[in-house]
């Protein structure tokens, strides 16, 4: 049975829209007992704000987790992946643990950097000696939405990122 018929680009877009109905832009746990993780790290929450960003929006990735290692600092890195599992970019941050073992931080992805599409986040927690403590794959997923364009260009702009670059005519 044929479910969809169209060009390759139309087919990819069709299935991306179907998959976007199953996006999970946040994951939250109320207590460390129910949270994802292990004896070292328990995930409290990961969120993308706004949940359905446009390419022209600043995108905030908010992270919160319990550091159960006893160390005062802990590293967390993420890879942002596209629909085809290609790494768009990654980042690392050294968290300082609070009195209640919580670590909280927000990463800002500037407006006009991301192209439209569906993205996933992998998380990696490590000690300051870079010993891997926990890896969480595809922990959240979200779609960055294109804005209406005023020019006659049709179709998706190439690339995973779409930075608004400064051009100087000379």
Write out the residue ranges for each language-model feature.
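Localized sequence-composition bias
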Residues: 1-170
């Amino acid at each position: 049975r044929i479910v969809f018929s169209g060009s390759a680009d139309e087919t990819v877009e069709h299935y991306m829209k179907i998959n976007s109905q199953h996006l999970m832009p946040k994951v939250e746990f109320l207590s460390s007992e129910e949270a994802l993780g292990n004896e070292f790290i328990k995930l409290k929450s990961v969120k993308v704000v706004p949940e359905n960003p446009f390419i022209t929006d600043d995108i905030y990735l908010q992270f919160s987790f319990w550091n159960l290692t006893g160390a005062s600092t802990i590293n967390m890195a993420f890879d942002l992946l596209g629909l085809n599992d290609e790494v768009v970019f990654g980042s690392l941050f050294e968290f300082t643990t609070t009195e209640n073992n919580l670590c909280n931080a927000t990463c800002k992805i500037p407006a006009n950097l991301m192209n439209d599409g569906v993205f996933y986040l992998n998380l990696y927690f490590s000690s300051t000696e870079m010993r891997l403590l926990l890896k969480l794959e595809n922990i959240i997923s979200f779609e960055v939405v294109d804005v209406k364009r005023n020019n006659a260009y049709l179709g998706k702009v190439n690339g995973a990122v779409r930075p608004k670059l400064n051009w100087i005519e000379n």
